[in-house]
Amino acid sequence: MSQDSKVFFRIFLGIGLVLILISVVVFYNQFTYSKDAIHTEGVIVDTVWHSSHSHRTGKDGSWYPVVAFRPTPDYTLIFNSSIGSDFYEDSEGDKVNVYYSPGHPEKAEINNPWVNFFKWGFIGIMGVIFIAVGLLISMPSSKKSRRKRKSRP
């Protein structure tokens, strides 16, 4: 393995391990938050279009659901979701899972497994890719290793 290959391998391995570590920490924090949170059912009562660029018109944006749920039987709380998607465009009346920290229903979020996976999964996948690229860089090519073996007495 050449000196350059060793340096690149170490850089890619280091970045990959850091990304995997971040992924594990995000997963653990999300798992413990979800485990300790209060889970309930909410209803999408409205959707709001937010454009990603205020000066443009057209399709650059997403639909954000407005969700109503009952933290107590006599109190209905309504919140705007921070997660938007075209999926929510015609979703008024749909039921969604909602979760929030005990004592803080005003900080409720939609419990979407795909969004939750994306928070830690994307970072972890990038870490695995960095490690794989580092391993590929560090592997000697078959032609180089054959030449070295033939040239040795």
Swiss-Prot record:
The keyword DNA repair does not apply. One of its GO terms (cellular component) is plasma membrane. GO terms for biological process: bacterial-type flagellum-dependent swarming motility. It is a multi-pass membrane protein. Residues 1-6, 138-153 are cytoplasmic. InterPro entries: DUF3592. Keywords: Cell inner membrane, Cell membrane, Membrane, Transmembrane, Transmembrane helix. Residues 28-116 are periplasmic. It is found in: Cell inner membrane. The chain crosses the membrane at residues 7-27, 117-137. This is Inner membrane protein YmfA. It comes from Escherichia coli (strain K12).
